[in-house]
């Protein structure tokens, strides 16, 4: 079993290592590689399946699935991945704080109700007696949005996490262990979260989390160097994503669902249900003060400072203004 502090040290050291190698970025001019999540349906997967990205940007697009945003950071550091679609903010902050030169260029999705922690049903623990979680065993994907949400919820309920046995587990593995009765509380997102809920209950709803300042959204992230060398390609990529969001918001949603479901590895019913809990900001909304116009930068700083306070990372940046670049999205808006 891995303690929280051991996991934190492992994540921090790993990210410091990848920060030292990110300068080895290599890009094949005829192909780019994009990281994404399975069981995480989004409208742009219609374009992924139909190769609309390839047609728009003029190069082959290879899609590689990941289990967590921390792995996306490592892949971008090594140069194996140029774009990560729907990377969680906490793993981005951990990598950026360690010195990796990444940037947020687009808000992929907002989803307060599709990332959460679930308590084992027979414990009969809810928000009225959450303090009883002390001493219990938890499965949490360290360094991710779910980890951030877990720590914020435990802080809210006054739960001393030092008394808990916390295992670093990706959502799919956590859901399986939870189903077998090996964990008391488990955290995750997407399809794994749905499976977790079959055996337990959440402590807070998405709306309740938002009131505590727990924002849950993902971003499209890139290697800064690669983006600067390929601005037109990146702008075209973001334009296709925005077009797919607009297409899904129109009357085309029904016809898109089967294609999205197949790409995401989920059935049509669960794909539709998941998408109903997602919000996809338009380009105009993303360029506003709420998002890339300042709100996102402030949230990055809040996450960084909180992780320092919790001992997850040794230090945060003075600010994360350089970690956000809206110029590519502004260019996409003109296409």
Q: What residue spans do the PLM features occupy?
A:
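Pocket-lining segment of extracytoplasmic ligand-binding domains
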Residues: 172-264
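N-terminal signal peptide c-region/cleavage motif recognized by signal peptidases
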Residues: 21-24
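Short, glycine-/small- and polar/acidic-enriched structural segments
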Residues: 30-160, 165-168, 184-190
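Ligand-binding "clamshell"
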Residues: 94-106, 195-209, 267, 288
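Conserved C-terminal helix/tail region of periplasmic/extracytoplasmic solute-binding proteins
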Residues: 300-335
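Bacterial N-terminal signal peptides that target proteins for export
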Residues: 1-13
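Secondary-structure end/capping motifs
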Residues: 229-312
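Periplasmic-binding protein-like
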Residues: 109-120, 202-227, 238-241, 278-281, ...
């Amino acid at each position: 079993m891995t303690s929280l502090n051991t996991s934190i040290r492992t994540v921090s050291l790993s990210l410091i290592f990848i920060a030292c190698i990110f300068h080895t970025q290599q890009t094949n001019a005829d192909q780019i590689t994009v990281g994404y999540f399975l069981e995480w349906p989004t409208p742009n997967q219609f374009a992924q399946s139909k190769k609309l990205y390839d047609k728009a940007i003029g190069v082959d697009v290879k899609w590689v699935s990941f289990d967590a945003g921390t792995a996306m950071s490592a892949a971008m550091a090594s140069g194996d991945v140029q774009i990560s679609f729907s990377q969680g903010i906490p793993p981005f902050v951990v990598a950026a704080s360690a010195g990796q030169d990444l940037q947020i260029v687009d808000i992929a999705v907002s989803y307060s109700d599709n990332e959460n922690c679930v308590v084992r049903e027979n414990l009969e623990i809810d928000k009225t007696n959450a303090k009883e979680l002390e001493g219990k065993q938890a499965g949490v994907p360290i360094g991710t949005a779910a980890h951030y949400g877990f720590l914020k919820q435990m802080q809210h309920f006054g739960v001393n996490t030092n008394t808990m046995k916390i295992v670093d587990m990706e959502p799919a593995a956590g859901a399986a262990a939870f189903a077998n009765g090996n964990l008391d509380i488990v955290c995750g997102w997407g399809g794994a979260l749905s499976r977790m809920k079959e055996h337990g209950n959440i402590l807070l709803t998405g709306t309740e989390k938002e009131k505590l300042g727990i924002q849950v959204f993902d971003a499209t992230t890139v290697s800064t160097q690669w983006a600067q060398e390929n601005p037109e390609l990146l702008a075209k990529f973001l334009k296709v994503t925005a077009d797919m969001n607009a297409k899904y918001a129109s009357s085309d949603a029904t016809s898109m669902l089967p294609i999205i479901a197949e790409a995401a590895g989920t059935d049509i019913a669960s794909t539709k249900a998941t998408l109903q809990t997602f919000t996809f900001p338009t380009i105009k909304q993303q360029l506003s003060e709420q998002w890339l116009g300042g709100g996102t930068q402030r949230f990055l700083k809040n996450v960084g400072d909180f992780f320092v306070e919790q001992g997850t990372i040794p230090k945060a940046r003075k600010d994360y203004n350089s970690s956000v670049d809206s110029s590519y999205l502004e260019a996409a808006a003109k296409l």
